[in-house]
């Protein structure tokens, strides 16, 4: 491609709305342009990168025995109603009606569609196993789109679905997909790690996320400092800290005027936050749920939602709901006598002695409270783990890092096949539900994650296999006929070799061209300058290194070396 013919618009200034490096650089390098909140148009340069990532995904999925398919993005409500997810998916689903007043949605995911296809096409165990996938645009009405394509309302995703006759078959399919994902992210130049995860609205049993460590990631990921254990904080089990046993004391009511926060309570009672139990009140659809945690702990909303079961939306209760449940102002809630539909008590609180709680009375607290004697509830793990707790597998300390999810694999089991009546005839002539798996990769999010891991102060540094162009050929002075002619000859020869080459034949200063080449992240640069009269050009790698002066034949060999180093063939 010649840049004089190319739709490209690099920006020197950082767009005001961009917060993270990938968002800034995707806009500055001319990869995309914003159309509305969370909605982007992909420019030619950006589309080439997306297609390169798609091709990697496609190759690895095909190598793993999956077949590509393309389903409709517009889905009738009936399929989602069959699975029970029409209501369960919540406000993130784009819903619409056609001219006949029939309900449809724009697919945020396609479990129902693929289950419907397979139940109509596959009748016998002899037709199994089956693994189908598609690469398609998805739609989710995010409450707060942010970070460019990291959390957008329209995004490109690879979603795949496996169908097996038994659990053994699902386990095999799941492992094949895990290996394929490892290959995909390695080829994309991403340092991604599989971590244990919650299944969320997708459902099912086993689940793993592929996480990329990132300071701007939206997830907290728990890692063991000694073994390979890793999990999303939503999934990671906490280790209760057992308090030292005490003799049970009588409950006392204490006046605490305007003392609401844990910090203020600890000062007032001259105690550690570990001697305080806070009561958080949530609205879970039409239920009011109270959760009791140790004062210094954070609630884990995923664990709470899983304990409640089938929750569409979980949020902190309104001030009015709190007053109705407690009879008091906000800040004085406690588990004794509270009027809620469900009372969840963290396992740590159940092992505390003589602790302090809200009295469900404004400006009042109770001390010397004990679980079992003074109140009871559903005991479980309802909090986030913290740095330094014990690994659930080896017992050593854990640490926590921020991460971005780029892929997710699930063992769905029979969740969808049973709810939608998707069955096959087994070896004994009996109808059985398909055992399903689900496998997703965020293609556009993967592109952004590559940029997050591969950039410097000058712009993007694309790994060779995903780069929009492999080599940028720059005539230092396009008005110099020899430089312009030789640059075009080199450009044409590279293309014959199978190299994606970009000829910057614009009537711009060499410095401008160098800056654009670096900003766009082109892995190799060949500059045709004053030394071309001696048959020499300059070669430079985007990811560092000095400028090399080479003959034209040597520069072709140098390009081949970089392809070999990246395990790519020409």
UniProtKB/Swiss-Prot annotation:
Keywords: Aminoacyl-tRNA synthetase, ATP-binding, Cytoplasm, Ligase, Nucleotide-binding, Protein biosynthesis
CDD domains: ProRS-INS (cd04334), ProRS_anticodon_short (cd00861), ProRS_core_prok (cd00779)
A GO cellular component annotation in the UniProt record: cytosol
InterPro entries according to UniProt: aa-tRNA-synt_IIb, aa-tRNA-synth_II, aa-tRNA-synth_II/BPL/LPL, Anticodon-bd, Anticodon-bd_dom_sf, Pro-tRNA-ligase_IIa, Pro-tRNA-synth_IIa_bac-type, Pro-tRNA-Synthase_IIa_type1
BP GO annotations: prolyl-tRNA aminoacylation
Entry EC number(s): 6.1.1.15
Record's subcellular location: Cytoplasm
Record's catalysed reaction(s): tRNA(Pro) + L-proline + ATP = L-prolyl-tRNA(Pro) + AMP + diphosphate
Molecular functions (GO terms): aminoacyl-tRNA deacylase activity; ATP binding; catalytic activity, acting on a protein; proline-tRNA ligase activity; transferase activity
EC class name: ligase
Superkingdom, natural source: Bacteria
Gene3D superfamilies xrefs: Anticodon-binding domain, Bira Bifunctional Protein, Domain 2
Domain notes: Consists of three domains: the N-terminal catalytic domain, the editing domain and the C-terminal anticodon-binding domain.
PANTHER family: MITOCHONDRIAL RIBOSOME PROTEIN L39/PROLYL-TRNA LIGASE FAMILY MEMBER, PROLINE--TRNA LIGASE
Assembly, per entry: Homodimer.
Family: Belongs to the class-II aminoacyl-tRNA synthetase family. ProS type 1 subfamily.
Cited HAMAP family: Pro_tRNA_synth_type1
Functional summary from the UniProt entry: Catalyzes the attachment of proline to tRNA(Pro) in a two-step reaction: proline is first activated by ATP to form Pro-AMP and then transferred to the acceptor end of tRNA(Pro). As ProRS can inadvertently accommodate and process non-cognate amino acids such as alanine and cysteine, to avoid such errors it has two additional distinct editing activities against alanine. One activity is designated as 'pretransfer' editing and involves the tRNA(Pro)-independent hydrolysis of activated Ala-AMP.
Name this protein carries in UniProt: Proline--tRNA ligase
Organism: Clostridium perfringens (strain ATCC 13124 / DSM 756 / JCM 1290 / NCIMB 6125 / NCTC 8237 / Type A)
């Amino acid at each position: 491609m010649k840049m004089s013919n190319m739709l490209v618009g690099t920006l020197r200034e950082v767009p005001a709305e961009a917060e993270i490096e990938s968002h800034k650089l995707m806009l500055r390098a001319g990869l995309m342009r914003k159309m509305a909140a969370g909605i982007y148009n992909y420019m030619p340069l950006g589309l080439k990168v997306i297609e390169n990532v798609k091709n990697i995904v496609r190759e690895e999925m095909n190598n793993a025995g999956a077949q590509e398919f393309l389903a409709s993005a517009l889905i009738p409500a009936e399929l989602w109603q069959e699975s029970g997810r029409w209501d369960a998916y919540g406000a993130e689903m784009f819903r619409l009606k056609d001219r006949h007043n029939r309900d449809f949605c724009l697919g945020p995911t396609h479990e129902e569609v693929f289950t419907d296809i397979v139940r109509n096409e596959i009748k016998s165990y002899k037709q199994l196993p089956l693994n189908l996938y598609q690469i398609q645009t998805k739609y989710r009405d995010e409450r707060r789109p942010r970070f460019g394509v990291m959390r957008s309302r329209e995004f490109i995703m690879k979603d795949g679905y496996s169908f097996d006759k038994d659990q053994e078959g699902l386990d095999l399919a799941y492992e094949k997909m895990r290996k394929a994902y490892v290959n995909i992210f390695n080829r994309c130049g991403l340092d991604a790690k599989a971590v244990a995860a919650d299944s969320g609205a997708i459902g099912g049993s086993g689940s793993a996320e592929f996480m990329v460590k990132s300071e701007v990631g939206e997830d907290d990921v728990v890692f063991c400092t000694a073994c390979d254990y890793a999990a999303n904080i939503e999934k990671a089990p906490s280790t209760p800290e057992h308090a030292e046993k005490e003799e049970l004391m009588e409950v006392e009511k204490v006046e605490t005027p305007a003392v609401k926060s844990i910090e203020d309570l600890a000062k007032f009672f001259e105690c550690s936050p570990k001697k305080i139990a806070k009561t958080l009140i949530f609205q879970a659809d039409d239920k009011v749920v109270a959760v009791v945690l140790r004062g210094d702990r954070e609630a884990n909303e995923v664990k709470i939602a899983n304990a409640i079961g089938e929750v569409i939306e979980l949020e902190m209760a309104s001030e009015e709901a709190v007053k109705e449940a407690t009879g008091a102002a906000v800040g004085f809630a406690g588990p004794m006598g509270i009027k809620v539909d469900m009372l969840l008590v963290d396992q740590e609180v159940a092992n505390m002695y003589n602790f302090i709680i809200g009295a469900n009375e404004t400006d009042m607290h109770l001390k010397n409270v004990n679980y079992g004697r003074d109140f009871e509830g559903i005991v479980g793990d309802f909090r986030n783990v913290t740095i330094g707790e014990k690994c659930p597998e080896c017992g050593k300390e854990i640490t926590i890092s921020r991460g971005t999810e780029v892929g997710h694999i699930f063992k769905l089991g029979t969740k969808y096949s049973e709810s939608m009546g998707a069955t096959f005839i087994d070896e004994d002539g009996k109808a059985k539900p398909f055992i399903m798996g689900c496998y997703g990769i965020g293609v556009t999010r993967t592109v952004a994650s590559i940029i997050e891991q591969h950039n410097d102060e000058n712009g993007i540094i694309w790994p060779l296999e995903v780069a929009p162009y492999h080599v940028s050929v720059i005539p230092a002075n396009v008005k110099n006929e020899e430089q312009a002619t030789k640059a075009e000859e080199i450009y044409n020869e590279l293309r014959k070799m199978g190299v994606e080459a970009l000829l910057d034949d614009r009537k711009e200063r060499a410095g401008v061209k160098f800056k654009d080449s670096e900003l766009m992240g082109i892995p190799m640069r060949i500059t045709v300058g004053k030394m071309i009269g001696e048959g020499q050009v300059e070669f430079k790698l985007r990811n560092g290194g000095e400028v090399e002066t080479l003959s034209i034949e040597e520069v072709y060999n140098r390009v081949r070396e970089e392809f070999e180093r990246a395990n790519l063939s020409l």
